[in-house]
Amino acid sequence: MAAGEPGDLGVYSFRFLPQKTFQSLSTPQTTSRLRQWSMLGRIEAQAFGFDQTFQAYRKDDFVTAFFKDPNVIPNLKLLSESSGEWLTLGTEVKKIEAINVPCTQLSMSFFNRLYDEAIVRDNGYIVKCLDSFCDPFLISDELRKVLLVEDSEKYEVFSQPEREEFLFCLFKHLCLGGALCQYEDVINPYLETTKLIYKDLVSVRKNPQTKKIQITSSIFKVTAYDSVGVCYPSTKSHEQTFSYFIVDPIKRHVHVLYHCYGMGEVS
């Protein structure tokens, strides 16, 4: 059914939820780490509410309505490529792309294979390797190699479906960081920060029948276009420039996780 039809399949409308804060991005420890990874001041999470039953198969209608909503346009934040200042959308979105991002992982044991495959030592130190480049990233350890180099020996430690998982994407984004990223020697800061942000953004509930915890969020990686071309998350494409929409169909909230690649705050 198309957007605009009556009942629960009507046009979505949204409201900004400025009172919703994301502690995972603002703790002193996370702030320090994001500064080291050149992401501080360039990563943002925002929350919006919506008023209709969310239907995953109508994701394109949902995202299109989001970008056209009068409560979204003056509040959705993005970074200016030219000035580096935070702006709001300020342009009419003509087209959107919303890619489904699987989200099934409930445990950080997903990353235990990094130890099993000697990418990380038992003491948590990341195994070093000879420097190489996978433009624009410097690869100086086995972790970045397994994240980026498709023909590397251990790339298949994670299957393609596993690499598409939101937990993996979040971990990879933090590991690669911004333009002046200072890489960690040990794995724990990446794992801890990934876990904090993941738990902050993703909704779960206990299944009343099975009593098992299950993820209720639907996640999309979103791009928007105006009459000129890509306008969101940025006019310039980069692997580390992204916007994820994390939709909670029960609370009727959408969390927007945004990052624009560049030089993060240093002080």
Swiss-Prot record:
Protein family membership: Belongs to the CFAP300 family.
Keyword Amino-acid biosynthesis attributed: no
Quaternary structure (record): Interacts with DNAAF2.
Any one of the GO CC terms: motile cilium
Transmembrane segments: none
UniProt feature coiled coil, ranges: none
Subcellular location: Cytoplasm; Cytoplasm, Cytoskeleton, Cilium axoneme
Species for this entry: Bos taurus (Bovine)
Function: Cilium- and flagellum-specific protein that plays a role in axonemal structure organization and motility. May play a role in outer and inner dynein arm assembly.
InterPro entries: CFAP300
Annotated Pfam families: CFAP300
Presence of the UniProt keyword Cytoplasm in the record: yes
The protein, known as: Cilia- and flagella-associated protein 300
Annotated keywords: Cell projection, Cytoplasm, Cytoskeleton
